[in-house]
């Protein structure tokens, strides 16, 4: 069978790598793909890049090539309604409809949904007037969190530790319109403390299948300093998610979300990612929903998945996820992101990457912002690669990842040296 995967990031390289391992699969087409999927030789099935991004063109390709299943990686095509287009063309696709994807594409929709269905989350208020937002911040004080309502590629959240920072964030979004439509409304919410974890599940409309837990590192610099990024590294499993917290997350967050979407007449199918804040006494609050797998969490999660992903996704599309169990590698997987010069601001592109090691049983390199140019792999985006190490402990996995990184070189390469530190006591 043939599979179509939408996207071009590290998450998509990891998904393509896993999908191509299925004995059922002949070709995985990645649209548009990256330098890693362009040079993927490590799997039994072929992985091919497809230079198409238009939704109808992708649907036409899927029809013409008799694609068995389409899997959507990033949020933008979901918010644009790719699932609706494919379903209207009678095609099998895994992901939420445009309406259901509002759980991620509108923070206001998501918060109102949680409030309506009793899902634990931070107190909040939504504003489109800068004047009213400033008054609210003055009344509430800092620290406080300012979020753009719409999709802002991971750059729409400001955790303001001071009033000045909070007011500046409101001005940036509402007054100066720096994020365009995404920042035309802002959600302002209370600051939560605790440990964050990423809880990612497959949903078939009614049934849920949990993937391995993970924890990521959002800040650019060691010791969680510097600006927020899309994520500088992640590891799986997340020790903070104990069996009790796992059960609680399913009971208090995931199942009420799936049932709530059904009750609201917009049943949810697809990956569902709940960003959770776990307080020291084990209480959970939902920070955000994403309608996709996290990046870089996908890379260590896929590195640990032993089961056939195609089989699980087929069951999800058919509404029979209750018949599936997943098997996981007992080892810890830890991924470290290598970023381009000047990231998270406008990154430099075109730097030649050398020394990429061959994948082994315990070291895997997933590409993100790379492309193939004149036979060489060069940087083409902010987060360039994610290097994953596997070992029996977090420390061991960390050592494997950094050992592999020691061979890789490109001008301006930046990465954190402490990924996983929270789990290494």
Annotated model-derived regions:
Residues 1-98:
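ATP-binding N-terminal substructure of ATP-dependent carboxylate-amine bond-forming enzymes
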Residues 21-23, 38-39, 94, 116-118, ...:
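Solvent-exposed alpha-helices and their adjacent loops that cap or buttress functional pockets
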Residues 160-298:
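Internal nucleotide-binding/catalytic subdomain
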Residues 165-168, 344-347, 392-399:
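Short, conserved charged micro-motifs
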Residues 250-272, 290-362, 372-373:
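Active-site "cap" helix and flanking loop/linker of ATP-utilizing ligase/carboxylase catalytic domains
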